[in-house]
Swiss-Prot record:
One of its GO terms (cellular component) is cytosol. Binds 1 zinc ion. Its EC number is 3.5.4.5. The lineage of its organism: Bacteria, Pseudomonadati, Pseudomonadota, Gammaproteobacteria, Pasteurellales. The keyword Metal-binding applies. SUPFAM superfamilies: Cytidine deaminase-like. GO terms for molecular function: cytidine deaminase activity; identical protein binding; zinc ion binding. Zn(2+) binds at H106, C133, C136. This is Cytidine deaminase. It comes from Actinobacillus succinogenes (strain ATCC 55618 / DSM 22257 / CCUG 43843 / 130Z). GO terms for biological process: cytidine deamination. Homodimer. InterPro entries: APOBEC/CMP_deaminase_Zn-bd, CMP_dCMP_dom, Cyd/dCyd_deaminase_Zn-bd, Cyt/Deoxycyt_deaminase, Cytidine_deaminase-like, Cytidine_deaminase_bacteria. The active site is at E108 (proton donor). It catalyses: cytidine + H2O + H(+) = uridine + NH4(+); 2'-deoxycytidine + H2O + H(+) = 2'-deoxyuridine + NH4(+).
Length: 296
């Protein structure tokens, strides 16, 4: 686990008088920094402290914010996505100094992407320590649960997403019925002997790109492990989430941000656009690596 994240978590335990917070941090440390909590643990902790799932998620926000990386804004945002399964998926904002602001990962994007890669089928609630910005409201409007997603803040609970985004423009306006978190039945018939290349291609098959059809996936060699990310497109285009950010986010929230990345593989289908250039830019500026690119 990243030393900075570990120090922040230790500080929470040492300085907080909140026994719930201490229990959550203890569980995260026991998991070697993996920033997600199973539905069984959520239920047991809620029962022990007589808290609803949303009340518990609100108490988790300082823990989620420990995963933020904000060298530009110095403004740490934490989020907790509550899955239909009942599991919690933490998220936090991540900025990349020296690169374009468009490369930034927003906390809500982080939590949503975390849940998506972990195999969650839908989200019921988004809990965040600051009001979602317009970018994130539009991003969450792409979810298969957007019509019923509840937003909870420390000062305001039980608000539907669409109360923050009235008269919203989204996938339905473009006749898209299979949306983010729905199964994406793509198949390229691509096979490769290199497991990391195959992992990138497999990630691209699960990407969501109904507008451009430019499906893309990234695979990172992180020590002995591989971490993948996939593209999540948005009807408004600019809030789309890129595959390298998706993979880096999952690496950080899996407690592996201190393990060096030695290879980056990108696999992409031909569509109305390409993310090769912007991915190469971040790979070079943030990781000092060149990507290995494969056209599908």
């Amino acid at each position: 686990m990243n030393d900075c994240i570990g120090k922040r978590l230790d500080k929470l335990i040492n300085e907080s008088q909140d026994e719930v917070l201490k229990r959550v941090v203890g569980q995260i440390l026991e998991q070697n920094g993996k920033a997600r909590i199973s539905q069984d643990w959520v239920r047991r902790c809620g029962d022990d402290f007589n808290l609803t799932a949303v009340e518990l998620a609100l108490r988790c926000l300082p823990v989620a914010a420990c995963y933020a990386s904000a060298p530009v804004s110095h403004f740490n945002v934490g989020a907790v996505a509550v899955g239909q399964s009942g599991a919690f998926y933490f998220g936090a904002n991540q900025e990349f100094s020296g690169d374009a602001v468009q490369q930034t990962v927003h906390a809500e994007q982080s939590a949503v992407s975390h849940a998506w890669l972990a195999g969650e089928v839908a989200l019921t609630d988004m809990v965040v320590n600051y009001t979602p910005c317009g970018h994130c409201r539009q991003f969450m409007n792409e979810l298969n649960s957007a019509d019923r997603l509840q937003i909870h803040l420390p000062h305001s609970r039980n608000n539907r997403l669409h109360s923050y985004l009235p008269d919203a423009f989204g996938p339905k306006d473009l006749n898209i019925s299979r949306v983010l978190f729905d199964p994406q039945p793509h198949s390229f018939g691509f096979t490769h002997a290199d497991p990391l290349v195959q992992a990138a291609a497999d990630a691209a098959e699960q990407a969501y790109a109904p507008y451009s059809r430019a499906l893309s996936g990234v695979a990172l060699q992180v020590g002995t492990q591989s971490i993948t990310g996939r593209y999540a497109e948005n009807a408004a285009f600019n809030p789309s989430f890129l595959p390298l950010q998706c993979a880096l986010n999952y690496r950080r929230l899996s407690g592996l941000s201190d393990v060096p990345v030695s290879r980056i593989v990108m696999a992409e289908s031909q569509g109305g656009l390409s993310h090769r250039s912007i991915t190469e830019q971040l790979a070079h500026s943030y990781l000092g690596l060149e990507i290995e690119y494969f056209a599908l």
